[in-house]
Amino acid sequence: MIINSLKRFGITTGAAASAAAKAAVIGLLNREKRNTVVIPTPIGLRLEIPVEKVEIDSGIACAEVKKFSGDNPDILDGLAIRCCAKLNESNEIVIVGGKGVGKVTRSGLKATMGETAISPTVRDMVINAIREVTDKGIQITIEVPNGDIIAENTLNKMVGIVGGISILGTTGIETPVSDDDYLEHIKCELNVIRQSYDFVVIAPGNSAAKYASKLFDSNSIIKVGDRIGDSIKLASSVFRKVILAGLPAKLLKVYAGIFNTHFSQGDARLESLTHASVLAGLPYDVLTKITNALSVEEAFTYMTKEQRRKVMKIVAEKILSRIKSFNGDINFCVIIFDYDGESLSRVGC
């Protein structure tokens, strides 16, 4: 078999915004139009990102960077992220969302209700990129031309973000984790981990891997994207113990029997959460709020910490049962984290 190992990684909307912001600040302060800029990322890597254009005027400069999605199918691929910079009188960096950036209308998301949909991690990325240029006070306005139109074809409205796209990203890098060929990469990575460990921690995404690294050696953790079921099958044949560690929204799909969690394969997150909440005996008024929520994160805001623990214990037990049903001999453990990284449930560990 010939494996295409030259998969192209992309950049997140947050990385594109950080690069555009840095290029705009350089234009504002140095009157210089850069073709590329280098930005820091939360994981320590530095990215050199092309800049499409820089416009410099009196007291303001704007720059555009195109979102590049690599080999991930993404409706945002090629979308322009525009940042405009001007000085302010403080020593602070103020980041605001302009036209084409969505507004948060429901609770439970990382951005506060009423604010623009720019994640805290992205705000930190933008600030760190600008601080490599200046210590002065800067106002950055992030815009996305046609972002309101593009957003109509995303899931934003379903989670309470309206009027534009979200500016997101936990690492700055977009990994082609949902590609079929990625299974070959997973096989290779599992073999490497097996040389040092008799167990493996399967984490669907970056946040899950980050939280799991507080409990396990980071070298024992593999990020598998949407291919949770396939990864468990592969791992169960070579490891003494397999640990699935994830956040509620992703694992609620597994609770429903969806082992490839890509959105094209199905979605039963809120239905699963409602079902588990009924089994946990949550009050009717809380159940009503959960069924009317637009996201798992929003639904969690209506539950106490103890209620979350009871519900996620049921979810973890059902996942364990499902995994055992197709591989009864597996030594399997499920850990579900809250959105702040705290462990809500551990079953089979």
Curated annotation (Swiss-Prot):
Keywords from the UniProt entry: Cobalamin biosynthesis, Methyltransferase, S-adenosyl-L-methionine, Transferase
Gene Ontology biological-process entries: anaerobic cobalamin biosynthetic process; methylation
Catalytic activity: Co-precorrin-5B + S-adenosyl-L-methionine = Co-precorrin-6A + S-adenosyl-L-homocysteine
GO MF annotation: an example: cobalt-precorrin-5B C1-methyltransferase activity
Signal peptide stretch: none
E.C. code: 2.1.1.195
Pfam family, one: CbiD
Associated pathway: Cofactor biosynthesis; adenosylcobalamin biosynthesis; cob(II)yrinate a,c-diamide from sirohydrochlorin (anaerobic route): step 6/10
InterPro entries associated with the record: CbiD, CbiD_sf
Protein family according to the UniProt entry: Belongs to the CbiD family.
Name of the protein in its database record: Cobalt-precorrin-5B C(1)-methyltransferase
Annotated source species: Saccharolobus islandicus (strain M.14.25 / Kamchatka #1)
Gene: cbiD
